[in-house]
Amino acid sequence: MCYHIIAFIAGFVLDLLIGDPHFIPHPVRLIGSLISFLDKRLNCDAGYNSSEKKLNLTKYKRGVLLAFTVIFATFAVSVIILVVAYSINLYAGVIAEAVMTWQILATKCLRVESMRVYDALRTDGVEAGRRAVSMIVGRDTSVLDESGVTRAAVETVAENTSDGVIAPMLYTAIGGPVLGFVYKAVNTMDSMLGYKNDKYMYFGRFAARLDDVVNFIPARISAYLMIGAAFIGGRQFDGRNAYRIFKRDRFNHASPNSAQTESVCAGALRVQLAGDAVYFGKLVKKKYIGDRLREIEYEDIKRANRLMYITAFLCEFLSVAGMSLVLMRL
């Protein structure tokens, strides 16, 4: 257990220092390739002359098959890597576990991608900001003004504090890199298949629901950790308002989980997030999150990242403390 704690800490440090360099092949991209491969072969109507109801049921069943195939493949490969590494010697096992933990987390990657939006807005203006933010959000960015671009970037940091940092960290603390990568597989399936359009309405439904389930508890833990971060993060954050907006607006989203950390971030920064957005040429009505106590500005992207980092350090500290307590009882 002691070696697992060392690997867990080392993986977090590697994530903070190295992040996700594009020249290093990332396992999540391999998972995405598997999902794409299965999607092309399973999500089709060819050969079916059934009623629409039966066809939709078939799509749903195929989506379930895809999900379990991806989860099993991810689980099996992760186990094999660790077994082989630890069979060489203890040091190889710890190194493998640390590297896998590093690639599960996305703390620095989230900061780098969102700060590109900040840099673009600060140096080149709104058009450059639109191009930068289009790389990290799914909405139509061509209609966004500077406030809209900033809001999209802040929302991405807030939501992905849970999905990309805290949730995978918690699952890795509980079940090692194997469970961490299984979580990443579920999260990747949701991001690729969880659309409410004709192609994925039924085929991607199981993946989307599974993602809601695995994120239900971590999203709420993330929110409370972020509230704590707002209280200890200095005068730029309003901890009391973060808690107030969280209690009021944490369900102002179609997903039961997404507004948990978004509401905390909105309250901590004293800005208003969410609201209507354009996706694939269609206006999607969304509730607002937070109160517009001041106008949002591109500096809020930097503040949101600071809040995310403090939250990540809190989670790492508490996770290591919890793992150490378990070790002491063994």
Label for each model-derived stretch:
Residues 1-181, 186, 194-330:
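Hydrophobic alpha-helical transmembrane segments
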